[in-house]
From Swiss-Prot:
Keyword Magnesium: yes
KW RNA-binding (keyword) present: no
Primary gene name: pyrG
Regulation of catalytic or functional activity: Allosterically activated by GTP, when glutamine is the substrate; GTP has no effect on the reaction when ammonia is the substrate. The allosteric effector GTP functions by stabilizing the protein conformation that binds the tetrahedral intermediate(s) formed during glutamine hydrolysis. Inhibited by the product CTP, via allosteric rather than competitive inhibition.
Keyword set, alphabetical order: ATP-binding, Glutamine amidotransferase, Ligase, Magnesium, Metal-binding, Nucleotide-binding, Pyrimidine biosynthesis
Subunit-level organization: Homotetramer.
Name this protein carries in UniProt: CTP synthase
Residues the entry annotates as binding L-glutamine: 352, 380-383, 403, 470
Miscellaneous: CTPSs have evolved a hybrid strategy for distinguishing between UTP and CTP. The overlapping regions of the product feedback inhibitory and substrate sites recognize a common feature in both compounds, the triphosphate moiety. To differentiate isosteric substrate and product pyrimidine rings, an additional pocket far from the expected kinase/ligase catalytic site, specifically recognizes the cytosine and ribose portions of the product inhibitor.
UniProt-recorded Gene Ontology molecular function terms: ATP binding; CTP synthase activity; glutaminase activity; identical protein binding; metal ion binding
Positions bound to UTP: 14, 187-192, 223
Disulfide bonds: none
Reactions catalysed: UTP + L-glutamine + ATP + H2O = CTP + L-glutamate + ADP + phosphate + 2 H(+); L-glutamine + H2O = L-glutamate + NH4(+); UTP + NH4(+) + ATP = CTP + ADP + phosphate + 2 H(+)
Residues covered by the Glutamine amidotransferase type-1 domain: 291-542
Length: 545
């Protein structure tokens, strides 16, 4: 089987939406019956984004096999059925780390190790490995053409196109086509210069995606085609839209998938986008709306919670309601009090690290519990709910996590020192372990209690969810908390770790150690988020009476 590659680059400015464009194109090709996957190549020197600040980089998306990856992989999984893995994302840091390890072992037999051929060969090997078994692979190159960091990746894909044959390789370039109000027209010169920059590297784009706040007129697209040496039908206008789920239809309407299939000589049926049309219909025709407060510490960059925000929207689609998300800084709860939580239909506390703002989260969990407001806690959101219950219901004054107060009297949350990974191997950690790549990561099995709310929501007794944490409920103190009324609704497959807790005498209070947002999609949603949004809607109706 021959694998075809589409290399996706961006020019002029960053944040044009390469990830959304690649994912949308992949969704169309998948709808034509093709086996598609997407890769993201990041030029930064970090080995992975696992230890990067969420405020700088956005969320860390965790794959089933436990890789900590770029948030674009979340977009990929929300648009296509193919599951991402550690093969779908790698960085400059990972490449250099691998090459230097080989050099130390003597694998290069005394050769002078250089960017060309050693670094570029390592990049090509990983791209080919990630594409095995697929009809089409989209490879997104992070950054902007012209960045010094991107040069080894651009050189590698230039070589790769020659290696596999140009009949199996396409270059798709996203550029900005700005509209100047003073002139009353869009300007194509930035696109021309961006393509010129690509040509200087040896890459002639085959497809140009023109990003603008409005549709790029046909005469301007013809002008771009002429000056950039690209067929006119391969100059695609991608205007701003009110929903990213409209992009597949926008690209298909301009024949992009037909052009690609002809170039690759792929015989496949027309794309059926009815599932996406249904998503767009549900999004545009809600029967109501709810307001959900998300209390976190990284709210100045919403992308830090990208998958959670999307999962809440998916929950809204499943309930035919619009979800208005109010981002609340947990430190504001500490300084201004729980008054700022009034008028919310539900409260969610997402994952996070560090002591800053944690008391505000604990106060938020208490407010939700005592006022019968639907509550969903994720990762740290479960831990603060447990700490709050231990302090205020179980009589364990000053209960805390050893992450925040190492010598606290009641360490109800503590470091996991031992667990089994996805392959069944025992992992061991201590306080002295490195921060990077040392958490309990990836898909893990969870057994649900028969009498639990989550058992009803999932409709199954065993589930698999993705994790990213190094602290867990302390089983040594669990019995005292359970005796006070807290329900353990889910445990790990080996019965060693608490995965889900519930407050039984509450309309809807669920907190989980795993990250359900990573498996929520617009077409399928997720049981927890669908149930949570439904509970928010029901709470709103009760309050209106």
């Amino acid at each position: 089987m021959t694998t075809n590659y589409i290399f996706v680059t961006g020019g002029v400015v960053s944040s044009l939406g390469k990830g959304i464009a690649a994912a949308s194109l992949a969704a169309i090709l998948e709808a034509r019956g093709l086996n598609v996957t997407i890769m993201k190549l990041d030029p930064y020197i970090n080995v992975d984004p696992g230890t990067m600040s969420p405020i700088q980089h956005g969320e860390v998306f965790v794959t089933e096999d436990g890789a900590e990856t770029d948030l674009d992989l979340g977009h990929y999984e929300r648009f296509i059925r193919t599951k991402m893995s550690r093969r779908n994302n790698f960085t400059t840091g990972r490449i250099y780390s691998d090459v230097l390890r080989k050099e130390r072992r003597g694998d290069y037999l005394g050769a002078t190790v250089q960017v060309i051929p050693h670094i570029t060969n390592a990049i090509k090997e990983r791209v080919l490995e990630g594409g095995e078994g697929h009809d089409v692979v989209l490879v997104e190159i992070g950054g902007t053409v012209g960045d010094i960091e991107s040069l080894p990746f651009l050189e590698a894909i230039r070589q790769l196109a020659v290696d596999i044959g140009r009949e199996h390789a396409l270059f798709m370039h996203l550029t900005l086509v700005p509209y100047l109000a003073a002139a009353g027209e869009v300007k194509t010169k930035p696109t021309q210069h961006s393509v010129k920059e690509l040509l200087s590297i040896g890459i002639q784009p085959d497809i140009l995606i023109c990003r603008s706040d409005r549709a790029v007129p046909a005469n301007e697209r013809a002008k771009i085609a002429l000056f950039c040496n690209v067929p006119e039908k391969a100059v695609i206008s991608m205007k701003d839209v009110d929903s990213i789920y409209k992009i597949p239809g926008l690209l298909k309407s301009q024949g992009l998938d037909d052009y690609i299939c002809k170039r690759f000589s792929l015989n496949c049926p027309e794309a059926n986008l009815s599932e996406w049309e249904q998503v767009i219909y549900e999004e545009a025709n809600p029967a109501g709306e709810v307001t959900i407060g998300m209390v976190g510490k990284y709210i100045e960059l919403p992308d830090a919670y990208k998958s959670v925000i999307e999962a809440l929207k998916h929950g809204g689609l499943k309930n035919r309601v619009t979800v208005n998300i109010k981002l609340i800084d947990s430190q504001d709860v500490e300084t201004r009090g729980v008054e700022i939580l009034k008028d919310l239909d539900a409260i969610l506390i997402p994952g996070g690290f560090g002591y800053r703002g944690v008391e505000g989260k604990i106060a938020t969990a208490r407010y939700a519990r005592e006022n019968n407001i639907p509550y969903l806690g994720i990762c740290l959101g479960m831990q603060v709910a447990l700490i709050e219950f231990a302090r205020n219901v179980a009589g364990m004054d000053n209960a805390n996590s050893t992450e925040f107060v190492p010598d606290c009297k009641y360490p109800v949350v503590a470091l996991i020192t031992e667990w089994r990974d996805e392959d069944g191997n025992v992992e061991v950690r201590s306080e002295k372990s490195d921060l990077g790549g040392t958490m309990r990561l990836g898909a893990q099995q969870c057994q649900l209690s028969d009498d639990s709310l989550v058992r009803q929501l999932y409709g199954a007794s065993t589930i698999v969810e993705r994790h990213r944490h190094r602290y867990e409920v302390n089983n040594m103190l669990l019995k005292q908390i359970e005796a006070a009324g807290l329900r353990v609704a889910g445990r790990s497959g080996d019965d060693q770790l608490v995965e889900i807790i519930e407050v039984p005498n509450h309309p809807w209070f669920v907190a989980c150690q795993f990250h359900p947002e990573f498996t929520s999609t617009p077409r399928d949603g997720h049981p927890l988020f669908a149930g949570f949004v439904k509970a928010a809607s029901e709470h709103q109706k009760r309050q209106a009476k």
